[in-house]
From Swiss-Prot:
This is Probable chemoreceptor glutamine deamidase CheD. The keyword Heme does not apply. The gene is cheD. It catalyses: L-glutaminyl-[protein] + H2O = L-glutamyl-[protein] + NH4(+). Pfam families: CheD. It is an enzyme of class 3 (hydrolase). Its EC number is 3.5.1.44.
């Protein structure tokens, strides 16, 4: 058995997802109001995690068009990434984490994120086998995608505020898609 110290750690930041089949890998992230969905196919031995800032989609008029921040986009990418690597939709299971109410003056986007993730998975027929959402403090999350094991650590008030500051920054710019064709 591999000890935790020997695990290959892959950190997921806001707007990212990762799919792995390495039994020695652990996915990690830090969440405030953001949500991480952890999905896996226990038979295929493959799993993954995403980290999204807002529910909904980038097509709404107020979104700014950055799809990587939105739950709809990242949930689809995660599910499709699993299916492309051999998972079967009918065997997928999920765990949901995050969605804290980290700033009292803002609307409760964390609650909206968690509700969105639960509804999305319900609509897709993917059972949620575990969750830890809400509260007033952020979390550090570790997820072993092959075994489905998850562990979280609550953040202190100061750590939560640092996480909130990171979540409010714009997502990293995406590389432009090459749309021109050059003929020789």
């Amino acid at each position: 058995m591999i000890t935790e110290g020997a695990a290959r750690r892959v950190h997921i930041i806001q707007g990212e997802y990762k799919v792995l089949s390495d039994p020695n890998a652990v996915l990690s992230t830090i969440l405030g109001s953001c949500v991480a969905a952890c999905l896996r196919d226990p038979v295929a031995g493959i799993g993954g995690m995403n980290h999204f800032l807002l529910p909904g989609s980038a097509t709404s008029p107020t979104s700014g068009g950055d799809a990587t921040r939105y739950g709809v986009h990242l949930m689809e990418l995660l599910i499709n990434g699993l299916l492309k690597q051999g998972a079967r939709r009918d065997r997928l299971e999920a765990k949901i984490f995050g969605g804290a109410k980290t700033i009292s003056t803002f609307s409760n986007v964390g609650e909206q994120n968690a509700a969105f993730a639960m509804q999305f998975l319900r609509d897709e027929g993917i059972p949620v086998v575990g969750s830890s959402t809400g509260g007033e403090h952020g979390r550090k999350l570790e997820y072993w995608p092959v075994s489905g094991r998850a562990r979280q650590y609550p953040l202190t008030g100061a750590e939560t505020q640092r996480t909130v500051a990171l979540e409010q920054r714009p997502a990293a710019p995406q590389k432009p898609v090459e749309t021109s064709i050059e003929f020789f």
